[in-house]
């Protein structure tokens, strides 16, 4: 995890978290390059300043440039809140909610043999371990979990062909073996977590429309909380949504109002996911307001560090 610290002339600081993983190498250098246009400016006028920085990076819209802007925006808003001695959520209109529902994200993914050693935990190597993990989720106080696709073959691993990491790329069309293994995995989680726990499934970018239809139809009877599906065509996502009963969550990889609007207009998802470290908390609030106009609820995307968790919590509170 990486952090940006801004210091105003009076010594007030603002801090944000950003991440160079998952397609964002070199982000620190971009932040440093963009910040040269912000030096000496009024940090309280963050909307004006971010509009200027957006204009200066207009021809490199999205991607790493947007993540750099978001890191700066988040630090500016934090600086303003510290200067006024108020929580960030007060700058967003005050707390609408004081308690937030949480789910255990990427449940089991980091306990597969490849990464379990780094966390000093027992590796998950079979379905019995999944059952035990489901019990641990509930005993830890969580009412929901989100998981990925695991294959328990000779070397248990996470199946993620959409990231060119495993078999199935570039066709992005799951085999019967994958569909059956995924069903067994979800049933094992249900056995361990019990009938009342919500189970969410992250399928982001792993398939094309044909593949998503085959997977979601095969699992639609399991009563999952949502299928999480990221792809970049609103019409394709809307087709998938119309084809199943399970809610669809999406859009964690989008940037800004212009990125989200086509998906809202296509009625492509039931839950819109917003990444605060990627969009900036002020812009995220705008996206949430746009979602509300289309009667769509919002959830944060947060699989980073503890500061990002706090940033997302302030966003959700508002």
Where do the protein language model's features map onto the residues?
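Short beta-strand scaffold segments in enzyme catalytic cores
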Residues: 2-6
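Metal- or metallocofactor-binding catalytic centers and their adjacent structured scaffolds
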Residues: 7-84
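Conserved, mostly hydrophobic/aromatic
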Residues: 11, 34, 72, 85, ...
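Ligand-binding pocket scaffold of soluble enzyme catalytic domains
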Residues: 15, 83, 101, 122, ...
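Shared catalytic-loop signature of beta/alpha-barrel
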Residues: 34, 48, 217, 223-226, ...
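Short beta-strand/loop segments at the ligand-binding rim of alpha/beta enzyme cores
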Residues: 95, 101, 192-202, 241-251, ...
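Metal-dependent enolase-superfamily TIM-barrel catalytic cores that perform enediolate-based chemistry
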Residues: 99, 104-238
